[in-house]
Swiss-Prot record:
Record lineage: Bacteria, Pseudomonadati, Pseudomonadota, Gammaproteobacteria, Enterobacterales
PANTHER family documented for this protein: 4-AMINO-4-DEOXY-L-ARABINOSE-PHOSPHOUNDECAPRENOL FLIPPASE SUBUNIT ARNF-RELATED, SMR FAMILY PROTON-DEPENDENT DRUG EFFLUX TRANSPORTER SUGE
Gene from which the chain derives: arnF
Major localization listed first in the record, in broad terms: membrane
Name of the protein described by the UniProt record: Probable 4-amino-4-deoxy-L-arabinose-phosphoundecaprenol flippase subunit ArnF
Organism: Enterobacter sp. (strain 638)
Top-level taxon in the UniProt lineage: Bacteria
One term of GO molecular function: carbohydrate derivative transmembrane transporter activity
Record pathway: Bacterial outer membrane biogenesis; lipopolysaccharide biosynthesis
CC terms in the record's Gene Ontology section: plasma membrane
HAMAP family found in the cross-reference section: Flippase_ArnF
Annotated localization: Cell inner membrane
Length: 127
């Protein structure tokens, strides 16, 4: 059971990292504008903070993933990563500052991912 806890923590952290990185990339100046980008980091702007938090979330996610893989089979753990696609999509649609459009086609695709996850991760019925 702890393996699933660690896998879920990894998924939540990596999902949060994706959202923070997206927000940071929208908030920060382009990489080509070196002076403006450096100024954003030196001034500790919200975009720079979001970038650092996102990177740390990735690092902690890797630690959680390590703990998960020590406890559950890769064939069960790896499909759980697809839950991140579902969470990031739903959050991106729901968070107004990301300006992500909703579409029925994308909802269908995310639903297929979620159903596939259930099929892989639910216990097999023994006959």
């Amino acid at each position: 059971m702890m393996g699933y806890f660690w896998a879920l923590m990894s998924v939540l952290l990596v999902s949060g990292a994706q959202l923070m990185m997206k927000w940071a990339m929208v908030s920060l100046p382009p990489v080509g504008q070196t002076d403006a980008l450096m100024s954003a980091f030196m001034s500790v702007t919200p975009g720079a903070v979001a970038l650092v938090i996102g990177l740390f979330a990735y690092v902690f996610s890797m630690g959680c993933w390590y703990m998960a893989l020590r406890r559950i089979a890769l064939s069960k753990a790896y499909p759980l990563l697809s839950l991140s696609y579902v969470l990031v999509w739903a959050a991106a649609i729901g968070l107004p500052w990301l300006h992500e459009p909703f579409s029925v086609g994308k909802l269908a695709g995310v639903s297929v991912i979620f159903v596939g996850l259930l099929l892989v991760c639910l216990p097999d019925k023994k006959s």
